[in-house]
């Protein structure tokens, strides 16, 4: 088999594994919010604000990482990010004050924040005719980190005797143990990526900057003069706010507002990510029938599921109904994501693709970063249901604007 082709698939597999680990460590936190609150005696607003700090740093790294990748290629950026995230994860393993936990979360946010913009740019260049399908594969593997994270948390918090004996040897509380696994794997993947992809034409050649013709910052900002581009950014911002708000507090929402057991709530949380394979379908389908029909359907399903989730506590339908609604939200939200990335890569000029995608992801992740803090504050003030109603409105707005773009295409 041709070595360049092996390199292409190596790139897809390795960057997807790094993305899996980035999602895994991000989604370790929400199922651990209750344990963190018990350990430190902090409120919903406090843990939500801490997670907002994590996500804000993540968001702020989107544009710089894309711009640097436009100049230097993606491999160095991906390797550096994995090493930084690994260091932050290892820091959490040790018992420390709450401020130290927040600082480590910020470091992890910085390390994971450089990855997605760079990996989307890389995959779009390697697979120009199958961008939707390959981004679907990439996002599917990444989202499986969200399936694994709550399952690992449940295993650690209700550890059988053999596992409990191992956890007892660790320097910190049991709930910190998953971060040791994350840190070790992050360092290992960073080394594998550096060794396997450095110098690979598939991984570096297509995405390196061309000569000294580096884009200026003003060129990225001029992208927003295109009304359709700006409108689609609004779609992504509305989606991101709703999605990030839900994934930050869904376990607590299900246990407190829907009155489910904590272990049940954490397992239902994993359903959001267990349906991630829909991305393989929606990515490929969008290559065939167009981006907007798929995006509008996915956003509409996610918005409907959020409305149903807000209604569940008043109906008293229990865990089975909650599982159906959570799975529906997962189908809609995951179904949207690879198509969004593919459409953005089509909108962006070739020379601005990395930094341009970084600008958009900074905005959408910035909005998403504000969501956990907003949900936590509203939940403490008036309850979780009004907070989740706000998320439903944000997702509904995204669906309506996307439908308008489709109708005027």
Predicted stretch roles:
Residues 61-73, 279-290, 379-380:
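Helix-to-loop junctions at the C-terminal end of transmembrane segments
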Residues 345-384, 391:
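A late C-terminal transmembrane helix in Major Facilitator Superfamily
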Residues 102-144:
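Cytoplasmic helix-loop-helix junction between adjacent transmembrane helices
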Residues 129, 137-201:
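Helix-loop-helix hairpin linking two adjacent transmembrane segments in secondary transporters
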Residues 60-99:
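Conserved MFS/SLC helix-loop-helix module at the cytosolic interface between two early adjacent transmembrane helices
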Residues 30, 226-273, 277:
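Extracytoplasmic gate region of multi-pass secondary transporters
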Residues 194-218:
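Flexible cytoplasmic inter-helical loops of multi-pass small-molecule transporters
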Residues 289-343:
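C-terminal transmembrane helical hairpin of 12-TM major facilitator-type secondary transporters
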């Amino acid at each position: 088999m041709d070595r360049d082709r092996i390199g292409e698939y190596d790139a897809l597999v390795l960057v997807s594994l790094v993305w899996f680990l980035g999602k895994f460590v991000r989604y370790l936190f929400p199922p651990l919010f209750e344990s963190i609150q018990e350990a430190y005696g902090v409120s919903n607003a406090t843990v939500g604000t801490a997670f907002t700090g994590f996500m804000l740093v993540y968001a702020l790294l989107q544009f710089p990482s894309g711009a640097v990748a436009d100049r230097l290629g993606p491999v160095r950026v991906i390797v550096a990010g994995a090493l930084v995230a690994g260091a932050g994860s290892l820091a959490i393993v040790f018992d420390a004050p709450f401020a130290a936990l927040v600082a480590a979360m910020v470091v992890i946010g910085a390390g994971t924040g450089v990855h997605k913009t760079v990996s989307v740019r890389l995959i779009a260049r390697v697979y120009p005719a199958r961008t939707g399908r390959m981004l679907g594969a990439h996002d599917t593997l990444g989202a499986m980190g969200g399936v694994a994270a709550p399952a690992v948390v449940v295993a650690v918090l209700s550890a059988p005797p053999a596992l409990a004996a191992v956890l007892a040897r660790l320097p910190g509380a049991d709930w910190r143990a998953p971060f040791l696994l994350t840190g070790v794997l992050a360092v290992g993947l960073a080394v594998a990526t550096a060794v396997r992809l450095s110098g690979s034409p598939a991984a570096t050649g297509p995405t390196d900057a061309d000569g000294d013709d580096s884009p200026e910052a003003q060129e990225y900002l001029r992208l927003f003069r295109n009304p359709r581009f700006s409108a689609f950014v609004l779609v992504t911002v509305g989606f991101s706010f709703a999605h990030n708000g839900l994934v930050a507090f869904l376990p607590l929402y299900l246990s407190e507002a829907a009155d489910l057991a904590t272990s049940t709530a954490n397992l239902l949380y994993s359903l959001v990510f267990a349906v991630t394979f829909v991305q393989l379908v929606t990515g490929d389908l969008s290559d065939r029938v167009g981006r907007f029909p798929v995006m509008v359907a996915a956003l509409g399903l996610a918005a409907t599921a959020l409305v149903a989730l807000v209604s569940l506590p008043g109906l008293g339908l229990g865990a089975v109904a909650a599982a159906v609604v959570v799975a529906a939200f997962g189908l809609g939200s995951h179904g949207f994501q690879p198509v969004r990335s593919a459409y953005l890569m089509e909108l962006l000029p070739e020379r601005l693709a990395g930094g341009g995608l970084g600008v958009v992801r900074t905005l959408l992740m910035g909005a998403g970063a504000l969501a956990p803090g907003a949900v936590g504050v509203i939940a403490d003030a008036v309850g979780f249901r009004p907070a989740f109603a706000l998320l439903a409105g944000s997702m509904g707005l995204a669906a309506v604007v996307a439908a308008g773009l489709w109708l005027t295409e």
